[in-house]
Amino acid sequence: AGGARAHTGQTSTLDPRGEHLVCFTGGMFALGGKLFDVPEHVEIGRKLTDGCIWSYRALPLGVMPEVFHMIPCKDRTDCKWNETLWRSEASNRQGLSTDLELDAYIKKARLPKGFAQISDPRYILRPEAIESVFMMYRITGEEKYQDAAWEMFSAIIAASQTDIANAALSDITYSREQLESEGVDIRMDSMESFWMAETLKYFYLIFSEPDILSLDEWMFNTEAHPFRRNLPG
């Protein structure tokens, strides 16, 4: 996934940019596919959601960055890991010319494999990824989504908890060992209201019984407020 820029002549250019904010699209596709009986859209939703879960697991703190770039697959059906391609893309994005320069950049930026660039390494307690994980669990009943949710919750709490609340994080590319050895505190003096209104709500609901705010009877608006559906009869 990413952004696309349309040009004259019916051509377009893909910008392989990922954003935590866009992780809601997995749940959107899956829910629409389920409601309108379009299995292909449910599968698209699964792939998008699984990609966001992977983005959490790929970072040392287990938390996904705000904005990043990756390497698009040249073939949707055959996309094997290619370290040479990754290094080339990371080098090109920084305008580097030698392997020594690239190695130094990867070390300094703490760049995980697969990420060509992390342009915004913050995590601001966003809800979009767990929103889609919740939707996928309710739609499919697959327990792997509960497992992923618990991993995400545990990682976020471990990194963000303070004496009084939870804090946004300024740079999630550090490992816990690096934070301790370098004496760095990435917790910011900020906690958006959506942390409690949305993020924690979806974490709570994915471990609740399915009849609590069932998707058959309720819908959630953009800010995760539930509204009862006006069903026939």
PLM feature segments, named:
Residues 1-233:
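Glycan-recognition and catalytic cores of secretory/periplasmic carbohydrate-active enzymes
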